[in-house]
Amino acid sequence: MGLSDGEWQLVLNVWGKVEADVPSHGQEVLISLFKGHPETLEKFDKFKHLKSEDEMKASEELKKHGVTVLTALGGILKKKGHHEAELKPLAQSHATKHKIPVKYLEFISDAIVHVLQKKHPGDFGADAQGAMKKALELFRNDMAAKYKELGFQG
């Protein structure tokens, strides 16, 4: 299920575009997640009061959390699948503290792909999309394995 060097290069090329403006990408990813899957909002005490897209766009806390999410994911993607050290604390917190189901990781993966398609159509063609989907699936599968080790059936 691993990615080829070429696929990792496609992933990291488009991720460079994300890193050029992490706050707006993170905000758009979370808004896309919450609009597409409103049930995910219930996992975020800080955001569950945000009902409209305008309220979400105006929230500095939401923007800050988007930066946190995409910064952590970027660190994992740059490891090209060798992300054990980065994944362990993330899985620990998401399984034991936040209780985030693996399904929600799939939802946010879809939101990431959607935002990248929208913001970077010229740099995120079919090959890059396929590579990113594979990289995010690898991340989710490894998170699910860690969840299982921790006894979380998310």
From Swiss-Prot:
InterPro entries: Globin, Globin-like_sf, Myoglobin. Keywords: Cytoplasm, Heme, Iron, Metal-binding, Muscle protein, Oxidoreductase, Oxygen transport, Phosphoprotein, Transport. It is found in: Cytoplasm, Sarcoplasm. The keyword Nucleotide-binding does not apply. Its main location: cytoplasm. It is an enzyme of class 1 (oxidoreductase). It catalyses: Fe(III)-heme b-[protein] + nitric oxide + H2O = Fe(II)-heme b-[protein] + nitrite + 2 H(+); H2O2 + AH2 = A + 2 H2O. The keyword Phosphoprotein applies. One of its GO terms (cellular component) is sarcoplasm. Heme b binds at H94. GO terms for biological process: removal of superoxide radicals. The modification Phosphoserine is found at S4. GO terms for molecular function: heme binding; metal ion binding; nitrite reductase activity; oxygen binding; oxygen carrier activity; peroxidase activity. O2 binds at H65. Nitrite binds at H65. Its EC number is 1.7.-.-, 1.11.1.-. The modification Phosphothreonine is found at T68. Monomeric. Belongs to the globin family. Monomeric heme protein which primary function is to store oxygen and facilitate its diffusion within muscle tissues. Reversibly binds oxygen through a pentacoordinated heme iron and enables its timely and efficient release as needed during periods of heightened demand. Depending on the oxidative conditions of tissues and cells, and in addition to its ability to bind oxygen, it also has a nitrite reductase activity whereby it regulates the production of bioactive nitric oxide. This is Myoglobin.
